[in-house]
UniProtKB/Swiss-Prot annotation:
Family: Belongs to the UPF0763 family.
Entry-linked Pfam families: DUF2603 (PF10788)
Record protein name field: UPF0763 protein WS1752
Amino acid sequence: MEKLVESLSSNQKRNQALLHPFEGNEALLELTKGRLGNEEPCHVKGAQGEEYVILPKHLLLGLVNLLQKGREERVKLNLERDILQQMPIDFEDVWEVALQEIHRENANPSYVDTKRLIKEIKRRHPNLFFQLGDLFGRAKEEMLD
């Protein structure tokens, strides 16, 4: 994946091609440097100067997979932050309930609204969280006694 990023950002493009419009929906791809089919992208310049990149399928799938994992990691970090902000009694219990909810709803883990999810869990399972109002009320009663 590092070679892909390096090749895309480098001025040294090993594989280059020109795209020539043809009749109708057809076009001719003329390789001017390098070749198709190796482990690197091919940089294609269109007739109007627009730039394209042709990638081997496995590189594209690897890139998509890497992006998906990054999104899922970001959601996990957001989920952790949102759980902690709601003051759980046991973080692991709330984490498990949240993961079960995500799987139960067949939600894509990379697109979950974690704030909404945790607030809904707190509403349905208040026993999993500290209730500050109750704590302050009890402390006040104890001080008055």
